[in-house]
UniProtKB/Swiss-Prot annotation:
Source organism of the structure: Thermoanaerobacter pseudethanolicus (strain ATCC 33223 / 39E)
Protein name according to UniProt: 1-deoxy-D-xylulose 5-phosphate reductoisomerase
Alphabetic keyword roster: Isoprene biosynthesis, Manganese, Metal-binding, NADP, Oxidoreductase
Residues bound to 1-deoxy-D-xylulose 5-phosphate: K121, S147, E148, S172, H195, S208, N213, K214, E217
An annotated GO BP: isopentenyl diphosphate biosynthetic process, methylerythritol 4-phosphate pathway involved in terpenoid biosynthetic process
Length: 382
């Protein structure tokens, strides 16, 4: 039986991970769960899955949780709670918590020799070199939960990495595919949150609308698969049936196809290297799939993707700046403090102003993240 800790169990990926685990209760034991502030849902999860330990953001939430529960479960709090919970006996840590808050717990879990199922983008976007060096040193397995990276992993299995010509990440194009800059000047938050294919959290949905999500995935792919950025391409595929592809040096292309359901890559990460049937999964009916279309991304309109490639080429803390500026810019947009197109403008401005640090430490990364966010907030939250 595989012992599992889920960081961010009340979010989109966390709840779907537990939904998958319900299918294989005999194979998994939930050791720990964490939540930011959704105590009500966390209480339900505790009753259903009986973890030994949980963690929440602050003491008030912890007290609320104690009042809700009659079970004997240890409750940790704060950022230290996230770091402590991954020290408990477990085989796999699912990192589904959002933001830079996922970095230190992930590093701590790897240092403790635990395998990682990674759904947090910030970990590799900001500290890819540090994290993957540690993965090799500790000889653990780090598995991607993203549908695109899971697809690449599946397309690479059984093949020699030396024979890879390029990785091709597919993008749906988001809700504004085909629009030009002028069309996007007055888009609303609700319009940006209306993703055509995927049901996701608000932050990642906005990142999908700007194509920054795909930019982050390019950076992650570099570190996950140890490949240079000039061998990672992005293609817009509106149907979201092909989740990504690998092209080999003989011209062959291997693609992974599936319904747009995050439970499929979650299942693959949980059960790796085997596969299992999941109740309620839709199987593709190719007789109903009338066409698969592809187009180049519009880098002039959706500049965030270009900025991600630029940050990756520069290296060092520039990807941390990219991530931090995007995180707060998206928050400002969601709170109607800025317009949609200002997201890319704020990111570019932050990158231009940054004094880059090559080969940063974890402290450097955390400090740069904090400085960038504070600077943007001070300017736009007046």
């Amino acid at each position: 039986m595989k012992k599992v800790i889920i960081l961010g169990s009340t979010g989109s990926i966390g709840t779907q991970t537990l939904d998958v685990i319900k299918n294989f209760r005999e194979n998994f034991e939930i050791v720990g769960l964490t939540a930011y502030n959704n105590v009500e849902l966390l209480s339900k999860q505790i009753r259903e899955f009986n973890p030994k330990v949980v963690a929440v953001k602050d003491e008030d939430k912890a007290n609320q949780l104690r009042e809700n529960l009659k079970k004997n479960v240890e409750i940790l709090t704060g950022s230290k709670g996230l770091q402590e919970i991954v020290k408990y006996d477990a085989d796999l840590v699912v990192v589904a918590v959002e933001g830079i808050a996922g970095l230190i717990p992930t590093v701590t879990a790897i240092q403790r020799g635990k395998d990682i199922a990674l759904a947090n983008k910030e970990v590799l976007v900001t500290a890819g070199q540090i994290v993957m060096d540690l993965v090799k040193k500790k000889d653990i397995t780090l598995l991607p939960v993203d549908s695109e990276h899971s697809a690449i992993l599946q397309c690479l299995r059984g093949n020699d990495k030396k024979e890879v010509s390029r990785l091709i990440l597919t993008a749906s194009g988001g809700p504004f595919r085909g629009k030009k800059k002028e069309d996007l000047r007055k888009v609303t938050v609700n319009e940006a949150l209306n993703h055509p294919n995927w049901k996701m959290g608000k932050k990642i949905t906005i990142d999908s609308a700007t194509l920054m999500n795909k930019g982050f995935e390019v950076i992650e792919a570099k570190w996950l698969f140890d490949i240079s950025e000039d061998k990672i391409d992005v293609i817009v595929h509106p149907q979201s049936i092909i989740h990504s592809m690998v092209e080999y040096i003989d011209g062959s292309v291997i693609a992974q196809l599936a319904a747009a359901d995050m439970r499929i890559p979650i299942q693959y990460a949980l059960n790796y290297p085997t596969r299992n049937y999941i109740n309620g999964i839709n199987f593709l009916d190719f007789s109903l799939t009338t066409q698969l279309t592809f187009e180049k991304p519009d880098l002039e309109t959706f500049r965030c993707l270009s900025l991600a490639y630029e940050a990756l080429k520069i290296g060092g803390t520039m990807t941390t700046v990219l991530n931090a500026a995007d995180e707060i810019a998206v928050s400002l947009f969601l709170n109607k403090k800025i317009e949609f197109l200002q997201i890319a403008e704020i990111i570019e401005e932050s990158m231009k102003e940054h004094n880059n640090i090559q080969n940063p430490t974890l402290d450097d990364i955390i400090n740069v993240d904090k400085e960038v966010k504070e600077k943007i907030a001070k300017k736009y939250m007046r």
